[in-house]
């Protein structure tokens, strides 16, 4: 039996199953596919967004009938939930190899790596001759606010199974602390009771730097521990007698842009997620352009959801769903909306990969406006 409810087609079936002389009724099965009603006249995304007011909105790429009949439908041709509009600068880079750096060769015409200013990774400048700190004792001598640990470093964390116990002296685990951002808290000198990789309990007097990881875990890093540590933020109270001019720093992309990042600068990604799409990623990137980008984060309205970042441009054209009040309670739509609430911001700030993109005029416009702001 089929009936129409609020513009959505629902299928209700009853199957009688006999098992062990008992009859069971199956639950009604609801159609997962939404029946949309589309506008007849296709429009650019900007016109649709301006006329819709606040997002979200539902659209579909417009195809001429001949193209729609002959071409297989891609994700972008499916109904899309427009979720979030983005206006901001992105840094366009090309992959560079160590051979390119040594020979001075030009970057190949490879895919472009796009870095949004909200990307949470950490970089260093390749031309920077400053060196990272190599021991925790050297870090403790400066006592910065934040550092980036580039490699694994041996340390101690509280054993979660004994944290709430009545032990007079807490038990720690001796582990390798993963690379990442560390907030420097204080110096502690005391006996540390711990278990090593052989599960043997030991007790040792240690002088440690107490730090907090990105997931709010307190770690004890012994002064003799070796690694590679880049400064991120130093304290105003750092002694003038301590020379920190020749120590390597790590920067996020937003701070570098604010400080005047320009074309031709070469960066190395020290810590952060690489692009999810293949692009021959080398972690060494040469800045090609600084682009003012107008995009919208979207998602396919389907069981297999795919996130997209669409340029708000004159082409391609889209048609808009007209029957919004009728499908806003459909489970597939609600699932997609929930998925975007959870994932849209993270996706917007990921490294993206683009192909065959030339925007010299736009880049010059960004540079000119930046210089104008500096004069003001």
For the regions a protein language model found, what residue spans apply to each?
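Src homology 3 (SH3)-mediated interaction modules
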Residues: 2-376
């Amino acid at each position: 039996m089929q009936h129409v409810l609020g513009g959505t087609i629902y299928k209700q079936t009853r199957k009688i199953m006999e098992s062990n002389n008992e009859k069971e009724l199956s639950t009604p099965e609801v159609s997962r596919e939404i029946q949309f009603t589309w506008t007849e006249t296709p429009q650019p995304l900007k016109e649709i967004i301006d006329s819709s007011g606040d997002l979200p909105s539902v659209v579909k790429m417009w195809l001429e009938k001949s193209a729609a009949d002959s071409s297989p439908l891609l994700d972008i041709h499916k109904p899309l939930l427009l979720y979030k509009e983005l206006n901001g600068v992105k840094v366009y880079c090309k992959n560079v190899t160590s051979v390119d750096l040594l020979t001075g060769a030009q970057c190949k015409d490879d895919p472009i790596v796009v870095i949004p200013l909200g990307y949470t990774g950490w970089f260093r400048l390749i031309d920077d001759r400053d060196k990272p700190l190599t021991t925790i004792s050297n870090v403790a001598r400066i006592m910065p606010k934040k550092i980036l640990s580039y490699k694994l470093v041996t340390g101690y964390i509280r054993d979660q199974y004994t944290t709430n116990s009545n032990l007079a002296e807490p038990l720690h685990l001796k582990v390798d602390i993963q690379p990442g951002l560390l907030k420097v808290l204080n110096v502690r000198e005391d006996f540390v009771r711990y278990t090593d990789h052989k599960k043997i309990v030991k007790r040792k007097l240690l002088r440690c730097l107490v730090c907090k990881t990105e997931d709010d875990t307190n770690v004890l890093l012994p002064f003799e521990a070796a690694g590679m540590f880049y400064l991120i933020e130093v304290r105003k109270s750092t002694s003038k007698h301590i020379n920190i001019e020749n120590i390597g720093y790590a920067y996020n992309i937003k701070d570098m842009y604010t400080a005047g990042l320009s074309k031709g600068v070469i960066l190395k990604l020290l810590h952060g997620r690489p692009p999810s799409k293949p692009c021959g990623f080398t972690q060494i990137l040469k800045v090609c352009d600084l682009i003012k980008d107008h995009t919208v984060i979207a998602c396919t309205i389907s069981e297999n959801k795919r996130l997209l970042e669409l340029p708000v441009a004159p082409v391609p054209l889209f048609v808009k769903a007209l029957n919004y009040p009728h499908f806003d309670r459909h489970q597939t739509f609600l699932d997609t909306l929930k998925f975007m609430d959870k994932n849209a911001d993270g996706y917007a700030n990921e490294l993206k990969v683009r192909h065959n993109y030339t925007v010299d005029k736009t880049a010059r416009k960004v540079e000119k406006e930046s210089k104008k702001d500096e004069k003001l």
